[in-house]
């Protein structure tokens, strides 16, 4: 609820600053403008969530296509270890926060290949954007 209120305040400040929709405000009042702004904000949030879900599914399908057909106890143990994530002594772990497997690459550690670093960078930008919108 606080996020929607912050989005509403942000849109209201934009409308007041640039005098956008002055006739619309006079015609229908603030309540209708608020409803429209909340719908726009909710749409933006749903688009961001759907992009994250699609990228997660794409990453998990590419990992599953590479995995061996016959699984041995060592691969099962490594799979369980990858789902549990790293210990907190090695760094902050976001997998426990979002309940995501660690092979997606959302980890605040700089080790790994280029794909993992790119995913880390994208997630870091998304978190900064969300914090910027909420402030």
Swiss-Prot record:
GO CC field: membrane
Subcellular location: Membrane
Transmembrane parts of this sequence: 35-55
Membrane protein topology class: Single-pass membrane protein
Primary location class: membrane
Key words of the record: Membrane, Transmembrane, Transmembrane helix
Note: Almost completely overlaps SCD6.
Protein name as catalogued: Putative uncharacterized protein YPR130C
Species annotation: Saccharomyces cerevisiae (strain ATCC 204508 / S288c)
